[in-house]
């Protein structure tokens, strides 16, 4: 089985099947798919905005027609578990991640757009 066949099989799976697969992989290889995520502080006041913005929020405006690919991209980029990443995608429009540097935000935007989502930087 090659990589494309594996990806195709994963795309065909339901969310429940994906969750079980992740749990089985975690158990078999002794790893955790969930990475710690730092929570950004509250939004700064409007009067505190600098000339050039140094922190950006990645805003998921629309998930497009490829929901599973967008969920996978959100998981990969944020380190969230499957359930949490699905929640972020299901709650769109909304922020995926806040307080990122310009480079990190643009990289995240690019990867989410490759997955089929419409993304804005705020």
UniProtKB/Swiss-Prot annotation:
Quote a single Gene Ontology cellular component term. Answer: cytosolic large ribosomal subunit
The Gene Ontology biological process terms listed for this entry are: translation
Q: Which Gene3D superfamilies match?
A: 3.30.1390.10, Single helix bin
Query: Known InterPro entries for this protein?
Result: Ribosomal_bL12 (IPR000206), Ribosomal_bL12_C (IPR013823), Ribosomal_bL12_C/ClpS-like (IPR014719), Ribosomal_bL12_oligo (IPR008932), Ribosomal_bL12_oligo_N_sf (IPR036235)
**Keywords of this entry:** Ribonucleoprotein, Ribosomal protein
Q: Which GO terms describe its molecular function?
A: mRNA binding; structural constituent of ribosome
Q: What's one Pfam family here?
A: Ribosomal_L12
Biased composition, Basic and acidic residues: where in the chain?
99-114
KW Ribonucleoprotein (keyword) present:
yes
Q: Which portions of the sequence form the region Disordered? A: 94-122
- Say which family it is in: Belongs to the bacterial ribosomal protein bL12 family.
What PANTHER family does this protein's entry cite? 39S RIBOSOMAL PROTEIN L12, LARGE RIBOSOMAL SUBUNIT PROTEIN BL12M
Classification via NCBIfam families? L12 (TIGR00855)
What does the UniProt function comment say about this protein? Forms part of the ribosomal stalk which helps the ribosome interact with GTP-bound translation factors. Is thus essential for accurate translation.
Q: Which proteins does it associate with, and in what oligomeric form? A: Homodimer. Part of the ribosomal stalk of the 50S ribosomal subunit. Forms a multimeric L10(L12)X complex, where L10 forms an elongated spine to which 2 to 4 L12 dimers bind in a sequential fashion. Binds GTP-bound translation factors.
Recorded protein name is Large ribosomal subunit protein bL12
